[in-house]
């Protein structure tokens, strides 16, 4: 494993640990998810370019499309929750609350 792959893997693990540790606020969770998607995109792109596997060259672009959809849905959920409750706590997303 080269240093580039190790650094990208470390960025993914750091984002994952941030998602697990700071999951009380929705905004920090969304930022950690975006960091994970960005590191996955860079890892896939470098792997495909290094292996000269041209048939899978569209895969990172498809991942970016899904990341953009995830970001749009997450931000709309953040706006809805902050307008309704005034905060961005994840505990406000519990549907079993009265």
Curated annotation (Swiss-Prot):
GO terms for cellular component: mitochondrial inner membrane; respiratory chain complex I. It holds the Pfam family Oxidored_q2. The chain crosses the membrane at residues 1-21, 29-49, 61-81. It comes from the Eukaryota. Keywords: Electron transport, Membrane, Mitochondrion, Mitochondrion inner membrane, NAD, Respiratory chain, Translocase, Transmembrane, Transmembrane helix, Transport, Ubiquinone. The keyword Mitochondrion applies. GO terms for biological process: ATP synthesis coupled electron transport. It is a multi-pass membrane protein. GO terms for molecular function: NADH dehydrogenase (ubiquinone) activity. Disulfide bonds: none annotated. It catalyses: a ubiquinone + NADH + 5 H(+)(in) = a ubiquinol + NAD(+) + 4 H(+)(out). Its main location: mitochondrion. InterPro entries: NADH_UbQ_OxRdtase_chain4L/K (IPR001133), NUOK/Mnh_C1-like (IPR039428). PANTHER family: NADH-UBIQUINONE OXIDOREDUCTASE CHAIN 4L, NADH-UBIQUINONE OXIDOREDUCTASE SUBUNIT ND4L. Belongs to the complex I subunit 4L family. Core subunit of respiratory chain NADH dehydrogenase (Complex I) which is composed of 45 different subunits. Core subunit of the mitochondrial membrane respiratory chain NADH dehydrogenase (Complex I) which catalyzes electron transfer from NADH through the respiratory chain, using ubiquinone as an electron acceptor. Part of the enzyme membrane arm which is embedded in the lipid bilayer and involved in proton translocation. This is NADH-ubiquinone oxidoreductase chain 4L. It comes from Ommatophoca rossii (Ross seal).
């Amino acid at each position: 494993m080269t240093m580039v792959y190790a650094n990208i893997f470390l960025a993914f693990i750091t984002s994952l640990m941030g998602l697990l540790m700071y999951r009380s606020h929705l905004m920090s969770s969304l930022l950690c998810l975006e960091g994970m998607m960005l590191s996955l995109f860079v890892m896939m792109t470098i792997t495909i370019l290094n292996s000269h596997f041209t048939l899978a060259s569209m895969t990172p672009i498809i991942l970016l499309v899904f990341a953009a959809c995830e970001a749009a849905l997450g931000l709309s959920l953040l706006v809805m929750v902050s307008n309704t409750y005034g905060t961005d706590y994840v505990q406000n997303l519990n549907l079993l609350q009265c």
